Amino acid sequence: TLKEKVRLATILGTFQATLTNFKYLRNVWKKNTEEERLLGVSLTGIMDNKLPSTTGNTLEVMLEVLRDTAVQTNAAMAKQLKIPQSTAVTCVKPSGTVSQLTDAASGIHARHNPYYIRTVRGDNKDPLTQFLMSQGIPAEPDVMKPDSTTVFSFPMKSPSGAITRTQMN
């Protein structure tokens, strides 16, 4: 179930909160990390699920249950690990790359439109940028950094029946 997935992700995140020895950062960050132990359990594609996105306050209730699951799981695991409980636990955040990799709507947002253009920026010295250009992917110089950055455009199609922002009130 989704609740079990949130519980397991929270356990992993709480384990991760014990990793505070950042050799490449100043000690103030180690201190901050050990005090706050922030925890993010990322849900994405929420609006791709028809039930919570279309029926009254179902989404709100579901997110509250999942948040409570994450907070309670974190408290129990922190106690076992003898570390402070996280000062903040979040279950929804903006999503970019993960939603693209899984073809899911970003975070809690509906998809943009049935058809849209997805843009991706690349540094002109990056071999991937050079490869995309050599393959004829539509591209143009970035308006803010035309000498160093290229913007690629990819046509996108939302899945059939996907909820789009134009359907939201």
Please provide the spans of the model-predicted regions:
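Internal maturation/activation junctions in enzymes
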Residues: 20-27, 45-94
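Short capping micro-motif at the N-terminus of alpha-helices
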Residues: 87, 100-101
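Short, electropositive, low-hydrophobicity segments enriched in small/polar residues
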Residues: 44, 49, 100, 111
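Electropositive phosphate-/nucleotide-binding environments in soluble metabolic enzymes
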Residues: 40, 64, 68-71, 122, ...
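Catalytic alpha/beta core of large soluble enzyme barrels
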Residues: 1-25, 32-35, 94, 101-169
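Terminal amphipathic helices with adjacent charged low-complexity linkers/tails
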Residues: 37-43
